[in-house]
């Protein structure tokens, strides 16, 4: 129901739609032949800024109530972390064009403007109306067991930051 109701796609984000995904389940019984009396599951929801977070949380509560009526189960929902994204940096902001120019000049990279469905250090600046960008060279291993960072990438990123400082 949530994916259908909140189906807007925004090409600036990766993924381009809101997500409502179960990401962690805690152990509840010690043996395979025991039916658990309780279950504890965590969801990671990344909501596009177009939506009202409180409305989505209300919809989740309503879904839980419907399931309780249907099954007799008791469902308790607890929000462990909630963050409403601040207004995004304008794609034409000076810092955006400066970073794109630096990437083109120093690394021959044609950058595209985008966002992620999660928190970054830029959010703290955007909350106080400072346009901010986030960028780095990565191998797409974040939050995985084999997560790593290459020294070569860090050095190349430092060259971009140095170029930006020279232009400021």
Label the predicted regions:
Residues 1-168:
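Metal-dependent amide/peptide-bond hydrolase catalytic core
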């Amino acid at each position: 129901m949530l994916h259908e109701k909140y189906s807007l796609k925004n090409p600036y984000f990766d993924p381009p739609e809101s997500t409502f995904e179960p990401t962690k389940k805690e152990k509840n019984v010690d043996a395979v032949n025991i039916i658990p009396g309780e279950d504890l599951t965590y969801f990671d929801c990344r909501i596009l800024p177009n939506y009202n977070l409180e409305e989505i949380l209300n919809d989740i509560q309503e879904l839980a109530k419907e399931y309780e009526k249907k099954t007799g189960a008791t469902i308790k929902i607890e929000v462990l972390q909630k963050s409403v994204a601040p207004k995004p940096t304008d794609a034409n902001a000076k810092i955006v064009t400066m970073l794109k120019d630096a990437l083109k000049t120093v690394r021959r990279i044609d950058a595209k403007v985008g966002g992620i469905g999660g928190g970054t250090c830029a959010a703290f600046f955007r909350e106080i109306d400072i346009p901010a960008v986030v960028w780095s060279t990565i191998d797409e291993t974040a939050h995985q067991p084999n997560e790593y960072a290459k020294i070569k990438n860090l050095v190349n990123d430092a060259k971009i930051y140095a170029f930006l400082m020279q232009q400021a």
